[in-house]
Amino acid sequence: MPEPYDVITMGRIGVDLYPLQAGLPLARVDAFGKFLGGSPTNVAVAAARLGRRTAVVTRTGRDAFGEYLHQQLREFGVDDRWVTAVGEYPTPVTFCEIFPPDDFPLYFYRQPKAPDLEIHESELDLDAVRSARVFWMTGTGLCAEPSCSATLAALRARNRCGITVFDLDWRPMFWEEPQRAAADGPPHPAASARYREALAHATVAVGNLDECEIATGEREPYAAARALLAAGVELAVVKQGPAGVLAVHRDGSVADVPPLPVEVVNGLGAGDAFGGALCHGLLAGWETARIMRYANAAGAIVASRLACSSAMPFPHEVEAALTAGTAGAAGPGSSPPQAPTESGTAS
C-alpha cells in the first residue's frame, strides 16, 4: 500500500494576480505578479514548506493557466496527481488591491463556474483520503454541486479517523440561495445547514468570527468555540484578527494566544499559512498553545510579504520569528513598492 500523505487538501485553486504596487486601486496599477492561489491549495503549499508530504484534490481549466498551476504545485513539492482539467470552464483568476495594514479587497473571476466546483464523487481516491493523516476541506467546497456531494463523501469516508479539518472559509459571493426564510432564522440557511452536516464529520474546525457565525450562529469567541464543539469537533480554532486566536479542545484545554507583531504588507494568505502550520503542529503532537503560537508566527510572516503561496515560510523562519517576537519580510514574496505620493516619491 502506498505511504499515506501527511496532508491532503480539497477545494479551491486559481491564479492570483497581485499588484506589485501598494496603495493604488486596480485602475491605476500597471504591474502585477502571477502566483498559485486558492486557500486549500495554499494550505498544502504551507504544509509542504514545513516538511510535510502533501497533495491537493481540485480541478483547473484546460488552459495555459491550468498548466501554470500544475507547474507551480510541482515546484512547491505538492503532489498534483488529483488535479484534473475541465474543458468547459476556464481556470479562475483572482485580483486584489493592497492597502496596508488591513484593507485588501479581493476580486474573484470564477464565471460561469469554477472548475474546482466540478469535483465528482466518482473521481475521488477514497482510499488515499481515508489514509491521509490530515484531510483538509473548506466551506467553499459545499457551495455548489457536484463539489458539495464529493466533499461530503470524502468526509464520510474519513469517518472521523485521523485529523479531519473543516476550514469554514465563508465566501458569500460563491453561494446562490434565497433570502432567509424567517425573520429570526439564519441569514444564509442553506449554507448553515451544509456547514452543520460537515461539522458532524470533522475533528477540527477553523474560522474567523464571521465564519463561526455562519456555522453556529455565534459571534462571541468562547460561545462560538463551545458551539463548534457541540457540533461534533474535538478542537475549535476561532481566529480573532488583531485579538489573536482562541483554541478550545474537548478535553477542556484552552489557548488564547495573542498575535505576533508584524508590519503588514499583504494580509491575504496569512490564514493559509496558519492552516499549514496548524496541520504541522497537530501532526507533531504538540500541545495546543504551542501549535497556536507557531501557526500565528507562520501567518505573521506571510502577512509581512506580498504573495501568498511563494511567501509560505520554512521552519527556520518560523522559529526565528518566535525567538525574535516579531515577523519580518525577509524571504520569498518581497514587499511591493509603495504608491507614489503627490511629490512623486515613495510614501
Segment roles from a protein language model:
Residues P2, L126-R130, A198-L199:
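A short, aliphatic-rich alpha-helical micro-motif
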Residues V134-A227, A243-V245:
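Conserved beta-alpha-beta core of the PfkB/ribokinase-like small-molecule kinase fold
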Residues R53-G139, A320-S347:
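Conserved N-terminal subdomain of the carbohydrate kinase-like
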Residues R53-T54, D80, G162-T164, A236:
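Hydrophobic anchor at the start of a short beta-strand
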Residues A47, N208, G271:
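Short, conserved phosphate/pyrophosphate- and ester-handling motifs at nucleotide-, phospho-/glycolipid
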Residues G51, G77, C161-G162, G232, ...:
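Glycine-centered short loops/turns at secondary-structure junctions
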Residues M1-I8, R156, S192, G217-S347:
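Conserved phosphate-binding/catalytic region of the ribokinase-like
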Residues M1-D79, E263-V265, S334, Q338-S347:
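Glycine-rich phosphate/adenosyl-contacting loop at the front of the ribokinase-like
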